[in-house]
From Swiss-Prot:
Lineage top rank: taxon: Bacteria
Enzyme Commission number, as recorded: 3.1.3.15, 4.2.1.19
InterPro entries hit by this protein: HAD-like_sf, HAD-SF_hydro_IIIA, HAD_sf, His_synth_bifunc_HisB, HisB_N, Histidinol-phos, IGPD_sf, ImidazoleglycerolP_deHydtase
Name of this protein: Histidine biosynthesis bifunctional protein HisB
GO biological process terms, semicolon-separated: L-histidine biosynthetic process
Species: Actinobacillus succinogenes (strain ATCC 55618 / DSM 22257 / CCUG 43843 / 130Z)
PROSITE patterns cross-referenced by the UniProt entry: IGP_DEHYDRATASE_1 (PS00954), IGP_DEHYDRATASE_2 (PS00955)
SUPFAM superfamilies found in the cross-reference section: HAD-like, Ribosomal protein S5 domain 2-like
Stretches the record annotates as Histidinol-phosphatase: 1-175
Predominant cellular place of this UniProt entry's protein: cytoplasm
Keywords noted in UniProt: Amino-acid biosynthesis, Cytoplasm, Histidine biosynthesis, Hydrolase, Lyase, Magnesium, Metal-binding, Multifunctional enzyme, Zinc
Positions annotated to bind Mg(2+): D10, D12, D130
Length: 364
């Protein structure tokens, strides 16, 4: 049987809203669809098969009677079907965490048929869900995850990533693409950058938090990239982070090309619980001013001191003038906001606005 591209999709908190009071959808009044989930699935259905995978704690017990579950669930399925959205399977684990079953996500027993018969293509199948257990399920299946978030990764963005839609009005220009391979005694790196399309980024450096940060650059930069790095992580992550930045900066510089028609300048000032600022000029003159105070040495498997070093390396290989600053209390969020704001600013700089070189000197 031919392997298929399958989306294994969580239900509560992903397809429909999950009540924060009791985390149960046990009445029609609680049934609320996530924004734009139906238009997104309609776009995706010609490319992917859908399988619903859900944990429903205590389903069929006095704490969550089957009849209370069935009414809103059947209404949800009927609405999906009426709009032309069909799920090949609806797989539900009724157990609680303390039951110790092997079918509760992130365990894979619910998907045993798909694993044993090799029904899904690992290269083109994904788990979509809002929880860390969904991400872990994807890892256990050997596929990639997209973690749903109503703002940061909503259904519009998910459809955009999975369909790889063109995001730049590039006219008759050749699509801006670059590929860089960099091999040293410490690292073996390959970077591919597509500046004029979005899609799922395939990023594997061996440093989980760093992978997540690189994905933020591409996602908020409005482009697609693949990054593969095999580094000397048995020593530490320094060479991996530094050399990846050098390779990525080189790839971005090559993909941008002669800079004719680009906006060149960018400025972003987002305000969350962290205040992150970024200004950028693709000037051809490398410079960085970085202001951040980290109170922890590590976030996950990533050394916080490498944050500045990453941006310094990428600025100098891109030949960009870069100013970055962040304030806040949560170290994870501070670093993440820097990568996001860098991506957002880069998005402005590489935007095509015409055909002129944005410099009075006639050269950049």
């Amino acid at each position: 049987m031919t392997q298929q591209s399958i989306l294994f999709i969580d239900r509560d908190g992903t397809l429909i809203d999950e009540p924060k009071t009791d985390f149960q959808i046990d009445s029609l009044e609680k049934l609320k669809f996530e924004p734009n989930v139906i238009p997104a699935l309609l776009k995706l259905k010609n490319k992917y098969r859908f399988v619903m995978v859900s944990n429903q704690d205590g389903l069929g017990t006095s704490s969550f009677p089957q009849a209370d579950f069935d009414k809103p669930h059947n209404a949800m399925m009927a609405l999906f079907n009426s709009q032309g959205i069909e799920f090949d399977d609806v797989l539900i684990c009724p157990h609680k965490p303390e039951d110790g079953c092997d079918c509760r996500k992130p365990q894979t027993k619910l998907l045993q048929k798909y694993i044993e018969r090799e029904l899904f293509d690992p290269a083109t199948s994904f788990v979509i869900g809002d929880r860390a257990t969904d991400v872990q399920l994807a890892e256990n299946l050997g596929i990639r995850a997209i973690q749903y978030h109503p703002e940061k990764m909503n259904w519009d963005l998910i459809a955009e990533k999975l369909l790889g839609e063109s995001v730049t009005n590039n006219g008759d220009r050749t699509p801006r693409y670059a590929e860089v391979a960099r091999k040293t005694k410490e690292t073996d790196i390959k970077v591919q950058v597509w500046l004029d399309e979005t899609g799922v980024n395939d990023i594997k450096t061996g440093v989980g938090f760093f992978d997540h940060m690189l994905d933020q650059i591409a996602t908020h930069g409005g482009f697609r990239m693949n990054v593969s790095c095999k580094g000397d992580l048995w020593i530490d992550e320094h060479h991996t982070v530094e050399d990846t930045a050098l390779a990525l900066g080189t790839a971005l510089k090559q993909a941008i090309g002669d800079k004719r028609g680009i906006a060149r300048f960018g400025f972003v000032l987002p305000m969350d619980e962290c205040k992150a600022e970024c200004t950028m000029d693709l000037s051809g003159r490398p410079f960085i001013k970085f202001k951040a105070d980290f109170k922890r040495d590590k976030v996950g498997d990533f050394s916080t001191e490498l944050t500045e070093h990453f941006f310094q390396s990428i600025a100098f290989t891109m030949l960009a003038t870069l100013h970055l600053a962040v304030e806040g209390d949560n170290e994870h969020h501070k670093i993440e906001s820097l990568f996001k704001v860098f991506g957002r600013t880069l998005r402005q700089c590489i935007r095509i606005e015409g055909n002129e070189l944005p410099s009075s000197k006639g050269v950049l």
